[in-house]
Amino acid sequence: DGDNVRTGLNKDLGFTPEDRAENVRRVAEVSKLMRDSGVVVFVALVSPYRSDRETAASLFVESEFVEVFVDTPVDICSERDPKGLYAKAAAGNLPNMTGVGQIYEPPVSPDLILRGTGDLEASANLLVAAILEA
């Protein structure tokens, strides 16, 4: 989880494009080490730039990396906002917020697209089915 990683391994990083790239790179490298040890790894991370996601994917053989795009409009994210981040961004207190103050580049061809506007249980079931098929 991105929040967990940013309190430890990546606590020295901010939210500039360069720091975001380094955040994704470090998480991918650790994930690769874990995968090489036989662990099945799930990474929940905001990765706004395609090039960073492509770099992460390049560390793995194709069958080991599954890109899941949770396609959720910013207004829905703002409504759900459990941490109050979108409210802070709207007030101008969080200028680097992905999708608000910084761009998000959607994946070109993700392995799975989950609609964030739909039923959460149905989305979870689609994710589990995709994992079991992989």
List each language-model region with its residue ranges:
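Short, solvent-exposed loop/turn segments at secondary-structure junctions
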Residues: 7-9, 49-52
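Small-molecule kinase domains that catalyze NTP-dependent phosphoryl transfer to phosphate-bearing small molecules
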Residues: 71-129, 133-134
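Conserved catalytic network of the ASCE P-loop NTPase/AAA+ motor domain
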Residues: 32-39, 58-63, 104-107
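Short beta-strand segments at enzyme active-site cores
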Residues: 1-2, 37-47
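Conserved ATPase-coupling elements of RecA-like P-loop NTPase cores
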Residues: 13, 53-54
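Conserved substrate/cofactor phosphate-moiety recognition/catalytic segment
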Residues: 1-36
